[in-house]
């Protein structure tokens, strides 16, 4: 091979390698406010993206894939109760409870279901019965999965169950959050921190560090979904209803705010 051709190929290859993370960041940053096409029987439980061109919406008994404009690309019926979800290496991981939530005696039936992010085909089911009050939310950090869920009345802390890539429990973390109604609904790790959406009156956003030490407790509704998309940029979900009572889903840009937790951006 001629030296000039070899040099050109090396330059192109290097540019491609260097450009790949930049393109990924650009793609993530291109996510904007969006409404999910269609209406659904049950309310939104969580959202995530593939960090490129798709948004995933969990409507309790419907799992929906849309493009960045909210146009449905794929939709499947799923078992109740499919909760929050996260994306990792081409797969969706969904927190699923087939039993009772928030029961002091347990009686939950907690799982993580794994789907192909392109086709929504079911790949695997992992038991997570350690999530005693019902698996409702999930996030991923450094290739490990963190499952959250229900909570009985009066319990003044929340729990995070850490699993390895094979869904073997490695640790149960305690968040000194104070009581949150029905536990934690949604979870995402972004910008070096955990963000947890909770029910309540008012609804609560919890923020912790990587060791689940409290960084903030804010009166903000992220209980239907929260996902990071770029540095200093997240999407939070809303779930209005139609006049017939059918459930809708939308995502709204937000940025971190020291006093409020997050602020919607115009």
Residue spans of the language-model regions?
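Repeated scaffold domains used in trafficking and secretory/extracellular systems
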Residues: 41-46, 79-87, 130-140, 179-186, ...
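Short coil/turn segments that connect the beta-strands within blades of beta-propeller domains
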Residues: 52-53, 89-90, 142-144, 191-192, ...
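Beta-strand-rich domains and repeat architectures in extracellular enzymes and scaffolds
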Residues: 34-61, 81-84
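Conserved beta-strand positions in repeat-built beta-propeller and related beta-rich domains
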Residues: 56-60, 94-106, 147-155, 196-200, ...
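A short beta-strand motif characteristic of beta-propeller blades
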Residues: 31-38, 70-76, 121-128, 169-177, ...
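Structural motif
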Residues: 64, 102-113, 154-161, 202-207, ...
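Blade-loop segments of beta-propeller domains
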Residues: 70-102, 107-110
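Short loop/turn segments that connect beta-strands within beta-propeller blades
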Residues: 67-71, 116-120, 164-168, 208-211
